[in-house]
Amino acid sequence: LEWKDKSYRELSGGQQQRCALARILASEPTAILLDEPFSALDSYLKYQLELELAETLGGFPGTVLWVSHDRGEVFRNCRRVCVIDRGRSQPVTTLGELFRSPGTEAAARLSGCKNYADARPREDAVFLPDWGLTLSCGRPVPEGVCRIGIRAHHVQLAGPGAENAFSCTAVKVVEDVFSTIVLLRPEGAAPEAPLLRMELDKDNWQAVPDKDRLTVSVPPEAILLLES
């Protein structure tokens, strides 16, 4: 190694990470704790080190506990996940279940969901008082549900006969790197109600004829039912 004669402080961030992992593995541990292992690195170096780390840990026979706020990092490297909210751990679940049915708002936020609203169960639907909407969920809604989550990419431009379609006013449009983010106010929403975030391909947004008033829809199965 070209840096074998340097002190730890003289190493770059990536070299320090590699050195730390080598020291850990040299002690032949039965478990490894990785606490935000890439938090101080730029995106390219993080990508390179993540690939190296995943390959190295692939041959590790013990348990790895990976602490992270990065949902992509968790999704790529972990099989099971446990959300900690205000010092309390929630039940351990699979990655698929976390993204499909997070169960709580804390878990939904960690999974990347951007839209939330108070909810009142209505058999197989929910009433959202802040937005003045009743949305079908396509399955029975438990009595304990008090919030719902909607992922930004599940808010869609409504086609003919779309279920859960409603009219909105576009309040703000934000051009992201590869997509367009539109912040919407549903008709009948309370003045202080949170805006609804929709994210779509740039080409799809450019093709919208009326960019001020839109009709959007949310698939029933895409509504996340959340308890406190």
Residue map of PLM features:
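A short hydrophobic/aromatic micro-motif that marks alpha-helical segments and, especially, helix-coil
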Residues: 57, 85, 118, 191-192
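ABC ATPase nucleotide-binding domains
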Residues: 1-106
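Flexible, active-site-adjacent loop/turn segments at secondary-structure boundaries
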Residues: 1, 97, 108, 153, ...
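Surface-exposed loop/turn and secondary-structure junction residues enriched for glycine/proline
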Residues: 11-14, 41, 48, 63, ...
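Small-residue-enriched segments and motifs
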Residues: 51, 105, 119, 166-171
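Non-catalytic connector elements of ABC transporters
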Residues: 114-116, 125-228
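C-terminal boundary and immediately downstream tail of ABC-type ATPase nucleotide-binding domains
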Residues: 99-122, 149
